[in-house]
C-alpha cells in the first residue's frame, strides 16, 4: 500500500468517525429535552478577534436573545444581514444585488468566493 493511499484512507476514517460522533451527540440532545446545554460553541479557525457569532453558544437559547444581551459586539453582523437582505429584495431590471454579481462572474466557485470574502471582511 502506498503512503498516499494510506494517508487518504486514514483521513477518510477520521472524517467518518468525527461525523458519526457529532450525529450521536445531536441525536442524544434531541431525545433528551432536559439537556438544554450541550457545551457547543461556534469558533472560527483564525486567531483574530472574536466576532459575535463565535461568542454565541447554545446556552443563549436563541440568536435574538444573544443580540439583546450583547448589542455592541454584533454591529457588523447585523449591518451585513440588513444590507444583504435589502439588496436581495430590491430588484432593478432583474438584477438581485449580490446574487447577480456571483452569477455574472460565471462558474460554480464564484458564490463560494463571495461568501469567503464576506466572512474575511467581517
Swiss-Prot record:
Pfam family, any one: Svs_4_5_6
Gene Ontology CC terms, in alphabetical order: extracellular region
Annotated signal peptide: 1-21
Polar residues bias (residue ranges): 27-37
Disulfide cross-links: none
Species annotation: Mus musculus
Record's protein name: Seminal vesicle secretory protein 5
Keyword annotations of the record: Secreted, Signal
Subcellular location: Secreted, Extracellular space
Tissue expression remark: Testis.
Key word Nuclease present: no
Amino acid at each position: 500500500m502506498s503512503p498516499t493511499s494510506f494517508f487518504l484512507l486514514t483521513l477518510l476514517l477520521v472524517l467518518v468517525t468525527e461525523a458519526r460522533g457529532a450525529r450521536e451527540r445531536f441525536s442524544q440532545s434531541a431525545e433528551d429535552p432536559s439537556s438544554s446545554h450541550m457545551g457547543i460553541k461556534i469558533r472560527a479557525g483564525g486567531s483574530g478577534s472574536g466576532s459575535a457569532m463565535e461568542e454565541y453558544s447554545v446556552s443563549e437559547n436563541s440568536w435574538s436573545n444573544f443580540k439583546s444581551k450583547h448589542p455592541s459586539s454584533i454591529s457588523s453582523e447585523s449591518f451585513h444581514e440588513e444590507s444583504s437582505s435589502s439588496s436581495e429584495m430590491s430588484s432593478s431590471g432583474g438584477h438581485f444585488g449580490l446574487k447577480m454579481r456571483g452569477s455574472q462572474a460565471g462558474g460554480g466557485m464564484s458564490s463560494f468566493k463571495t461568501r469567503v470574502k464576506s466572512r474575511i471582511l467581517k
